[in-house]
């Protein structure tokens, strides 16, 4: 873990309630794809966010939900915005977590995210493509409404870079014009795979979702030691 000051270079809206934040560290930092950072609002208030960028990039990208009802995220976003306006840096701790991508495995991969947990699998998916990993990779991204699929086109393009890559967006409450999968994202995985025994599975999303996913996937053959999510340490 590295503690470092970062300039807040960009805050832009991806949707009405989700923002992309770009931080530039004052010095080089190292982390593994799938790890997270903590934004230090104070010495006693540190808030974790998945790193959406890849380790070979010089900037740190975050995807932060800013809904007023979500004070945990909105307060962090307000701090970032304040520092950006004042042209002052923020303090972050980088390289935390144990759910990083296991590049030395030869198993096929399932990346599963709910909501802004997508930033976690976004980093891993791009790392996989950059390294030309030639294994089947299935990316499932679940959202409540289709307008929350803020990187849908980006991921469709990612899937076209390799015939073994697949991107499956899943919308919980779709409009009548939605053509894709519907319902709960973990159920889409269960419907698509008779057995999950052979897969490395990476999961990001709310703690409640992570618990449901772990239990359901193990029942369908997944090995707990081949399932990765930082939430698993707390549930």
Where are these regions (language model features)?
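Reductase modules of NAD(P)H-dependent flavoproteins
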Residues: 2, 140-235
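Ferredoxin-reductase
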Residues: 2-88, 145, 172-173
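Short, conserved phosphate/pyrophosphate- and ester-handling motifs at nucleotide-, phospho-/glycolipid
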Residues: 34, 117, 206
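A short, basic/flexible loop-to-alpha-helix module at the beginning of a structural domain
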Residues: 94-105
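Structural motif
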Residues: 108-110, 138, 200
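Histidine-anchored nucleotide/phosphate-binding helix
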Residues: 120-130
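Conserved S-adenosyl-L-methionine
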Residues: 130-137
């Amino acid at each position: 873990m590295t503690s470092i000051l970062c300039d807040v270079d960009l805050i832009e809206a991806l949707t009405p309630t989700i923002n992309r934040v770009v931080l530039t560290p004052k010095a080089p930092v190292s982390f593994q794809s799938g790890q997270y950072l903590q934004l230090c609002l104070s010495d006693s208030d540190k808030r974790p966010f998945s790193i959406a960028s890849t380790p070979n990039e010089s900037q740190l990208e975050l995807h932060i939900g800013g809904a007023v009802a979500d004070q945990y995220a909105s307060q962090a976003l307000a701090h970032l915005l304040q520092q950006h306006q004042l042209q002052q840096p923020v303090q972050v701790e980088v390289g935390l977590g144990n759910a990083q991508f296991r590049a030395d495995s030869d198993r096929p991969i399932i990346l599963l995210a709910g909501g802004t947990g997508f930033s976690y699998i976004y980093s891993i998916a791009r790392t996989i493509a950059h390294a030309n990993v030639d294994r089947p990779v299935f990316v499932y991204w679940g959202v409540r409404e289709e307008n929350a699929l803020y990187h849908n086109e980006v991921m469709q393009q990612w899937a076209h870079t390799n015939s073994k890559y697949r991107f499956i967006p899943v919308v919980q409450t779709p409009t009548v014009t939605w053509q894709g999968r519907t319902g709960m994202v973990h159920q889409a995985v269960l419907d698509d795979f008779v057995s999950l025994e052979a897969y490395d599975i990476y999961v990001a999303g709310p703690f409640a979702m992570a618990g449901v996913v772990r239990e359901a996937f193990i029942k369908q053959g997944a090995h707990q030691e081949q399932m990765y999510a930082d939430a698993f340490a707390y549930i």
